[in-house]
């Protein structure tokens, strides 16, 4: 017998109406990296932000942003 799989995504955020998911994605990515900077790479509190940005952002964007962070050219405030 197969186990049931429960799918979840980022909860609604009043700061972002449904028409602005690009900004929501970018903000969640920044929140995750700010959290890990403040609390450490293994902080459990930061995992929710990781789940949110991974659910909202296209993989190509995340790859590009990770690359930009490594080279110091990321356009956002971290």
Swiss-Prot record:
Tissue and organ distribution: Expressed in the whole plant.
Domain of life: Eukaryota
Protein localization: Mitochondrion
Domain CHCH residues, every copy: 22-65
Motif segment (Cx10C motif): 46-57
Record's keyword terms, sorted: Disulfide bond, Mitochondrion
Matches recorded under Gene3D superfamilies: Cytochrome c oxidase, subunit VIb
Keyword match Mitochondrion: yes
Segments carrying motif Cx9C motif: 25-35
Predominant cellular place of this UniProt entry's protein: mitochondrion
Any one GO CC term of the record: respiratory chain complex IV
Disulfide bridge map: 25-57, 35-46
Protein's job: This protein is one of the nuclear-coded polypeptide chains of cytochrome c oxidase, the terminal oxidase in mitochondrial electron transport. This protein may be one of the heme-binding subunits of the oxidase.
Family that this chain belongs to: Belongs to the cytochrome c oxidase subunit 6B (TC 3.D.4.8) family.
Protein name: Cytochrome c oxidase subunit 6b-3
Organism: Arabidopsis thaliana (Mouse-ear cress)
């Amino acid at each position: 017998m197969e186990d049931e799989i429960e799918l979840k995504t980022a909860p609604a955020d009043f700061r972002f109406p449904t028409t602005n998911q690009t900004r929501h994605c970018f903000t969640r990515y920044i929140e995750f990296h700010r959290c890990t900077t403040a609390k450490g790479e293994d902080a459990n509190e930061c995992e929710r932000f990781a789940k949110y940005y991974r659910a909202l952002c296209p993989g190509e964007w995340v790859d590009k942003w990770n690359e930009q962070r490594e080279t110091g050219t990321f356009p956002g405030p971290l």
